[in-house]
């Protein structure tokens, strides 16, 4: 890092690292403000901009979780991954009714450093659309997914609803399931009791596609 950080900036950077390690995703401005006792998210935004100017993080405009640690970017994967890397199938478009990891969906294998993720993922899913923009998940990103049929309230999940596979935030209200986007331009999805719904996995991290070029 080229420029020395202030004590407060270092606290924020440590909080971002801890949140990414625990959840796989960076905190929002409001979460930073609450954790560090700021009076408003605007104060957190000012510190984040200072961290970006000093080269510690990269900010994505318009996304509440659009924070990326500059020192956590994975290196380009070689043809043969090193022993320290994890080879993960990269899943592109998923055909209706077929398993996510069916051979025809796997575009290639990508070598990644497992320490980048909160848990070891089982595959990478290419993100399509901008419904999770405010969680910092953008079109073309690679979402690291751990296969699971269970998830906690508030976790970002990969779910199959009918013939579609979608990435959303899980919200349960008793027996009712709602799939929440992170973009006000998209509407929540209420899962009806007779819908064909299956939880395919939980998100444990994210790779920006430019890191693989």
Curated annotation (Swiss-Prot):
It catalyses: Hydrolysis of Ala-|-Gly bond in repressor LexA. The record marks 96-97 as: Cleavage. The keyword DNA damage applies. Its EC number is 3.4.21.88. It is an enzyme of class 3 (hydrolase). The active site is at residues 131, 168. InterPro entries: LexA, LexA-like, LexA/Signal_pep-like_sf, LexA_DNA-bd_dom, LexA_repressor, Peptidase_S24_LexA, Peptidase_S24_S26A/B/C, WH-like_DNA-bd_sf. GO terms for biological process: DNA repair; DNA replication; negative regulation of DNA-templated transcription; proteolysis; SOS response. One of its GO terms (molecular function) is DNA binding. SUPFAM superfamilies: LexA/Signal peptidase, Winged helix' DNA-binding domain. Keywords: Autocatalytic cleavage, DNA damage, DNA repair, DNA replication, DNA-binding, Hydrolase, Repressor, SOS response, Transcription, Transcription regulation. Homodimer. Represses a number of genes involved in the response to DNA damage (SOS response), including recA and lexA. In the presence of single-stranded DNA, RecA interacts with LexA causing an autocatalytic cleavage which disrupts the DNA-binding part of LexA, leading to derepression of the SOS regulon and eventually DNA repair. This is LexA repressor. It comes from Bordetella avium (strain 197N). The lineage of its organism: Bacteria, Pseudomonadati, Pseudomonadota, Betaproteobacteria, Burkholderiales. The gene is lexA.
